[in-house]
Amino acid sequence: MKRNQKIRWAFSGLSFFLCLVVSAQRPGEQVREGKPGREGHVYDGPYKGAYLREVAFPIGGIGAGMFCLEGTGAISHLSVRNSPDMFNEPPVFAAISVKQIPNSARVLEGPVPAWKKFGHRDAGLGSPGATWGLPRFREAEFLARFPFGEVTLRDKELPLDVHITGWSPFIPTDADNSSMPVGALEYSFRNVSTKTMDYVFSYNARNFMTLPDERQAANHIKSIHGGFVLSQDGTSEAPEKKGDFAIYTSDAGVVVDHCWFRGGWWDPFSMAWNNIEKGQVKAVAPVEKDAPGASLFVPFTLKPGEEKKIVLMMAWYVPDTHLRIGDEPTSPKDSTVPDLSRQLPSLYHKPWYSSKFSDVDAVASYWSEHYNELRGYSAAFRDAFYKSTLPPEVTEAIAANLTILKSPTVMRQYDGRFWAWEGSGDSWGSCHGSCTHVWNYAQALSHLFPSLERSLRNTEFGESQNADGHQTFRTSLPIRPVAHNFYAASDGQLGGIMKVYREWRISGDSAWLRGIYPRVKKSMDYCIRTWDPRHDGAVEEPHHNTYDIEFWGPNGMTTSFYLGALESMRAMGKYLGEDVDLYEELYEKGRKFMESQLFNGEYFIQKIQWKGLNAADPVEAARKSFGGGYSAEAVQLLQKEGPKYQYGTGCLSDGVLGSWIARVCGLPEPVDTAKIRQHLLSVYKYNLKKDLTDHSNPQRPGYAIGHEGGLLLCSWPRGGKLSLPFVYSDEVWTGIEYQVASHLIFEGRVKEGLDVVRTCRDRYAGDVRNPFDEYECGHWYARAMSSYALLEALTGVRYDAVERTLYVDSKVGDFTSFLSTATGFGNVSCRGGKVSVKVVYGKIPVEKIMVRGKLLSN
């Protein structure tokens, strides 16, 4: 991606249609118009009034950092130094002044949300340095049309319509252009007065790249065409402190003040505002160092009814970090593939963009040169996605969680491989290593950017797998072989096997499958040997899982994973001509076992077993696990109830999770669908609470509390709740809510599934929580991307690149929906018995269509 390199993409300006006069629909709910949720916000509609207060919409690139556009138009959560920095609201703002109207200067933002006045950092000191004390517009409204966030400002005292559009590139299948460290704010103005008016637009910033305790390294505000660069030098001992942030515009009339008035107290800020109030335009050259802030000005004139758009572009460059995570190998068995990290330029993580651009000027040049093309293709995605006629709560849920891919939760290392946290802490990554048992749930990346998702499989079955087939469920950073000194995650490792099948079907790359299959087989054989040594077809031995504990004895959750992995091995092995007899045998035994031994007539349970196993007793095993060992009281409890942290006779929302994973990977459900459906209906009946006021949650109540509703992770409708069930059992996780909702819909229970979705999104209406930050163990938590499965659940639309076959199985009658494949994206529609495909970008070669299980010729 050199400066003058052209963007490479396959774009089809034409549409192709496959029209089939068949009944492609089932009786079901027709799509409804957006309606207010329980809390009053219209699903997928604008946020205003009380529902605006928490809105913060991420803008940035995949693994490149971000800033958020708040519902008011303010900038916050600036996180561009390769780590999260929540609540970092830098002292930056746009402003407008009208020369013909006294006292007309306004910050181009809406009213400051009330919570900031006392709930923000440094509130007890009066919030020094904040811009909140400046005049601003009286009303604001926010509309999300991912990846675009739109703010409308109004003020009856100012005859000016103002519209702000914030965005950054997001183009499915084009991972590189979607991973740029850039963003843009487009300010549009319309003169609604009856007179010609003269205006001065300005964008103003303190040097927020300056590190507060840095005395050895200089800070600067440098020049760039049409703007300025906020800059902090690094040192030989700490190169990671170097960082640049460019703010500029292509407007021909721009004038730049590179150095605000220098002085003590609030002199620089006060003098900058004095200039804005007077409508003064000042050109000031850069100084050597310690410039407190800078402004760019664009004066313009509008006749009545005329409009003006100013495009403010941002680019940043922080090429170094001090991030190195993971224990080094302790055995020759730990390193079974070449250590590619030795080829990287640093022992520490370096972001992908630093391999493509030499400095911030190169980033800005590329951004400027390709701005219109990148915007056009991002808008093409937006238009295709929002062309959907699916229920608005579904569109809202999916789009809101695509922002995770722009958050500091995700990273790309120097060689382009994808790596991620589980979520983002306030100032740290939360739970490292592309955690397999969390990222199992996330379905968006595999469809939108398949090459990045496939890099995860290459890592899991490469650097993260040892000679025995044991996988570490947390990958090192930089990615390299790592010590295998903890339990494998049963759900993560078995889920990864199913996802190899998924990546094969999405990519159509059978050569890749053939190359990785021996390592996948070694992983599967490890799972059998470790958790099903007696070949019963069930996961019996203690097994670590996504609840950060070990389950003892067979259960529906992990046994469904086991069966799904066995079925995927059978399918892949047969295609490759491999011996799969053992996998078929275990699958049949396990299917019968799960249906006959683990189903109680309403739902699948766990049979707690801790004696007669190969594993050490729970007291010994706990010494290696999270949560520490057994106290004397815990040993007494063990003798009475069995191991801590089990669910036993409980109704687990994840109780058939492996079956859902199989379904979204394109595999058949591993057990009887009638029993699966009954389990899900029991989860809906017992675990979905519309009001949690009387619910006891001694764990982490902030996810759902009080009058709010939510889907509990587990309940015990038939009794039998242990004194210490698994550690998160009383919580509510959005990723599990969407998993259950989409699985219900897959099984034809659309009403119940949408009820779960609405209950979840009602908590994220903007008045209490940020609608674009579903959190669990950290902000922008990856599990919430299970919401993407709602697309396939409602429509049955799935593209198989191996067979070049499109599958359709609508649960909502006629529809138009979004489809993304490895080679392009577009829309699939079902109207009056006809199925059509419109390719918007790239290509989607369809040779066959399966509609409700019936093969139809093109």
Where do the PLM segments sit?
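Acidic/polar, glycine-enriched structural segments that form the non-catalytic walls/loops
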Residues: A24-G40, P46-Y51, V55, D155-P159, ...
